[in-house]
Amino acid sequence: MANITVFYNEDFGGKQVDLKPDEYKRDKLEALGIENNTISSVKVPPGVKAILYKNDDFTGDQIEVVANAEELGPLNNNVSSIKVMSVPVQPRARFFYKEQFDGKEVDLPPGQYTQAELERYGIDNNTISSVKPEGLKVVLFKNDNFSAGDTLSVTSNAPSLGAMNNNTSSIRITP
């Protein structure tokens, strides 16, 4: 069974604690050594997902995390409860910062990712240069929120993205 790992600092730094699938209110997190409002990044392997909540008792603002999240945006250092759930293992598309599958890489499962969500998972705006879809269909959008504009569909390894190289602001991944 896979666990998530929560970190006190962005980019997976600082104190870290593994959490197995379960529900964690503030008192349970504190019993595990996780102080309130200290989580800044989360590693989420295939087979689990996490829902992070601003308030105790699974209330308030929330974000669902389905892959490694280098930063948590508005919930950075602002998480008081967490649900960790087992989910079916899915293939993940792999995105690279450089052509020829080089440089920083980030894996994402099927889903829709706006620019804000891509940044949560470590993909800065306009930085993708090559893609391995791993059996999935990846659609790259030049504009955020999947809005009109240039797109590129990728169903096989793409060592270069042509006009979409370093020009992607949102992504849709489907089986």
Swiss-Prot record:
One of the GO BP terms on file: sporulation resulting in formation of a cellular spore
UniProt keyword terms in alphabetical order: Repeat, Sporulation
Lineage of the species this protein comes from: Bacteria, Pseudomonadati, Myxococcota, Myxococcia, Myxococcales
Limits of the Beta/gamma crystallin 'Greek key' domain: 2-46, 48-86, 91-135, 136-175
The keyword Repeat is annotated on this UniProt entry: yes
Origin species: Myxococcus xanthus
Keyword Secreted listed: no
Written domain comment of the UniProt record: Has a two-domain beta-structure, folded into four very similar Greek key motifs.
Residue numbers spanned by region Connecting peptide: 87-90
Family: Belongs to the beta/gamma-crystallin family.
Organism domain of life: Bacteria
PROSITE patterns the UniProt entry points to: CRYSTALLIN_BETA_GAMMA
Location(s), subcellular: Spore, Perispore
Identification of the protein by name: Development-specific protein S homolog
